[in-house]
Regions:
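Active/binding-pocket-proximal capping segment
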Residues: 16-18, 86-90, 109-114, 126-133
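Membrane-proximal cytoplasmic C-terminal regulatory module of class A 7TM GPCRs
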Residues: 119-146
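Small-polar-interrupted transmembrane alpha-helices in polytopic inner-membrane proteins
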Residues: 1, 80-97
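Interfacial helix-loop-helix junctions of multi-pass membrane proteins
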Residues: 5-13, 55, 90-116
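Membrane-interface helix-loop-helix junctions at transmembrane boundaries of multi-pass membrane enzymes
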Residues: 72-82
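Membrane-interfacial catalytic/cofactor-binding modules of polytopic membrane enzymes
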Residues: 2-74
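Perimembrane helix-loop junctions in membrane proteins
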Residues: 5-12, 74, 102, 124-132
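Hydrophobic transmembrane alpha-helices
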Residues: 68-73, 113-121
Length: 146
């Protein structure tokens, strides 16, 4: 988003296509949740967003897809994989429905996740020094139970 700043739908609806730095973040469609619950969760998160021009690619879409892919690969219990699949689809839908992303943003996020997964698994993990580092790191952060 530093190379190609892209405004989300809520920004275009509010300010048009003028590039204005210093515009505060906006909760957009997620404000309805805050209004219904009285919690102010999304106002607290998005209201302080320092960079409103980070819509492309949608990292919300990418992160959830990566979690889902690794749940599939790890042979997690079916209910966990199903839950992550539903959450992933829900985030993709919600990102567009609440005016935080366009469909193209979500699509590019999905492509980034797939590209990252393929690069990591089929290029980097085949390079021995990198694979050894990852194995040592995994052992360090998740020691085996005895």
């Amino acid at each position: 988003y530093y190379i190609h700043p892209a405004a989300p739908p809520w920004y275009v609806a509010k300010y048009g296509f003028d590039f204005m730095l210093g515009v505060p973040g906006d909760v957009a469609g997620l404000g309805a949740f805050d209004d219904m619950t009285g919690l102010g969760i999304f106002n607290g998160l998005y209201g302080r967003n320092a960079n409103v021009f980070a819509a492309v690619p949608s990292l919300h879409s990418a992160y959830t897809l990566v979690a889902f892919i690794y749940a599939l690969r790890s042979h997690s219990p079916r209910w966990i994989t199903a839950a992550l699949g539903i959450i992933t689809l829900g985030i993709w839908f919600t990102a567009v429905y609440t005016s935080h992303h366009y469909i193209i943003d979500v699509s590019l996020g999905i492509l980034c996740a797939l590209a990252g997964y393929l690069i990591f698994e089929y290029l980097l993990m085949r390079w021995r020094p990198f694979a050894r580092f990852i194995d040592r790191y995994a052992a360090y952060v998740a020691p085996r139970r005895r």
